[in-house]
């Protein structure tokens, strides 16, 4: 294991490359206490981090109890390290710098991904706002459907009225009178009721028939008149007196 402590930016370069200001010298040549420096490095590193071990530039390297120690300074910046061999220490320092650089590089793309999420959220928002437009366009379709249904009903009513008019023109009476004729005589123009004396397609009583029949058919049973004459008389009575003249109406 090798521990390297760098006290300044300039010292980082010195620690990694192994180049230091001043001449390399053994601790005994610099007049330093190896045991004291080794003990400080192992048990009290804060004191070594606070200030250089001596004034001026120095480059002190020694081995104490099978552990290498290195103390360097260019007169302004300083560093120190210890471990099992300087080669291993240099490798450890280089690996640490590389790991830090890789970690910073790996963290940067994660920060870049955040705007993409924001853009995605912005893209989704217009899709939600489009929903009311769909509802607005559906309403005219419903109105158009209602209008179409109303038009169909009106058309059916017109067709029904036209059909009734056609029937009325072909038989001489309206649809209601046709129903009355079916109930009164089954449509038989010669039908006669012996008990009441009513006769004809619409079962006219004699007095009623005389009030609406042409002069040449008055005083005669309605059953003796042609169907067209009976129809005209029935329609006249219906228009002037209403359907209440027939019990079966």
Curated annotation (Swiss-Prot):
The keyword tRNA processing does not apply. Pfam families: Transglycosylas. Residues 1-27 form the signal peptide. GO terms for cellular component: extracellular region. This is Probable transglycosylase SceD 2. The lineage of its organism: Bacteria, Bacillati, Bacillota, Bacilli, Bacillales. GO terms for molecular function: hydrolase activity, acting on glycosyl bonds. Residues 80-203 are annotated as: Disordered. Belongs to the transglycosylase family. SceD subfamily. It comes from Staphylococcus saprophyticus subsp. saprophyticus (strain ATCC 15305 / DSM 20229 / NCIMB 8711 / NCTC 7292 / S-41).
């Amino acid at each position: 294991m090798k521990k390297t402590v760098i006290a300044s930016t300039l010292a980082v370069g010195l620690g990694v490359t192994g180049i230091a200001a001043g001449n390399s010298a053994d601790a005994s040549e610099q007049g330093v206490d190896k045991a004291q420096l080794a003990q400080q490095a192992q048990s009290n590193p804060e004191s070594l981090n606070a200030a250089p071990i001596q004034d001026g530039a120095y480059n002190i390297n020694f081995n104490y109890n099978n552990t290498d120690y290195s103390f360097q300074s260019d007169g302004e910046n300083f560093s120190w390290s210890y471990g099992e061999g300087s080669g291993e220490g240099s490798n450890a320092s280089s690996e640490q710098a590389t790991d830090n650089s890789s970690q910073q590089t790996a963290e940067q793309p994660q920060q870049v991904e955040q705007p993409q999420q924001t853009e995605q959220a912005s893209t989704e928002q217009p899709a939600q706002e489009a929903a009311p437009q769909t509802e607005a366009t559906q309403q005219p379709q419903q109105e158009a459907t209602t209008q179409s249904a109303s038009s169909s009903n009106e058309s059916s009513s017109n067709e029904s009225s036209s059909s009734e008019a056609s029937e009325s023109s072909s038989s001489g009476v309206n649809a209601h009178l046709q129903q009355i004729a079916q109930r009164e005589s089954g449509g038989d123009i010669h039908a006669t009721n012996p008990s009441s004396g009513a006769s004809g397609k619409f079962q006219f009583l004699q007095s009623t028939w005389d009030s609406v029949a042409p002069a040449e058919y008055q005083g005669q049973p309605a059953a003796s008149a042609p169907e067209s004459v009976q129809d005209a008389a029935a329609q006249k009575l219906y228009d002037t007196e209403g359907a209440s003249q027939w019990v079966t109406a």
